[in-house]
Each structure stands twice: as C-alpha cells, then as structure tokens.
Amino acid sequence: MSAIKETIDISRTPEEVFSYVTDPTHLPEWQESAVRVRRLSEEPIAVGSKVSVTRRMGRRETTMTMQVIELDPPRSWHVHGIDGPVRGDVQGRIEPIDDGTHSRLTLAVDFEGHGIGKVLVPLVVRPHVRKEMPEDELTLKGILEAGAAR
C-alpha cells in the first residue's frame, strides 16, 4: 500500500515549522492519537535519536519506539518505528513559499504490520490515520500561526 500523504500551507518560516514538528514533545499538542512521548536519547534530536510514543486508537493504547533515520534542517526528516506490532514510517518535507516567509508542509505516513499488526494496519490503523491526518495538520497550522511555537 502507498503512504498516506497530506500537505498544508502554514504562515510561518520553514525554520519555525521544522523546529516545532521535529520536537517530539509537541506531538500530543497537535496529533489527536498521541497520548505520551518520552525521549529515549539525549537532546538535541539527531539521526539515531529514539523516542517512545504512546498512541490511542479507539479504546486501546499502544507504545512504539520511533528512531530518526534522516534529518535535514529545515527541509526534511524521516522517522521509523523499530518495535511493536504496528511500526510507523513518517517522512516530512517543508518547502519555503512566499519568499520563505511561509511554508508548505507535506507529511507522508506508512506502516509495517508485525504479528497482529498485519491485521490491524489495513483494518484499523490506516483508516484511522486517513481520517486523523487532515485534522492534525489543521491543528498544527493553528498552533503555529497563533505563535505558540516561538
């Protein structure tokens, strides 16, 4: 299956958007399913950094470890799940628009299912994420444009 992709324009510079979205402690602020985030590596975030993310889908909470595998500030990043039955793969790209005063953010999310995850990914996870992602991007836009990320 192909990645779920969403794009949104944000009235903030690429540097501001990148700084906020790549700080994993902000995930519960703008992602509906993110319940808790715990850094497993020292700051600052870098290639190889690991983060534990707990998400709620329906009545169930699951925790997975995500690892940064690419980081190109302020343009792009790539994180990949390394454990759990459902392993997310998230790629983000930020393009400057309006002479760099605004940004176009594109997020692409895909999943690998392991064990029971092979059933959960197509039946539960992908439909949930397809619905949640556009709402999450609107929440992110609202937070950043309100200036909360500064």
Positions of predicted regions on the chain:
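Hydrophobic ligand-binding cavity/cleft-lining segments
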Residues: M1-S41, A46, T139, A148-R150
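Residue-level preference for beta-strand/loop junctions
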Residues: S2, V47-S49, R60, V86, ...
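Short, surface-exposed coil-to-beta transition loops
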Residues: A3-K5, E61-T65, R87-Q91
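Generic structural detector for well-ordered beta-strands
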Residues: T7-S11, R38, Q67, R93, ...
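A short, structured loop/turn motif at beta-sheet edges
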Residues: P14-E15, E42-I45, E70-P74, R93-R104
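Short beta-strand segments that buttress and anchor functional surface loops
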Residues: S49-R56, W77-D83
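Short, cysteine-centered beta-strand-loop-beta hairpins and adjacent loop/turn segments enriched
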Residues: R56-T62, G113-I116
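Beta-strand/loop substructures that line and gate deep hydrophobic ligand-binding cavities in soluble
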Residues: H78-E135, L140-G142
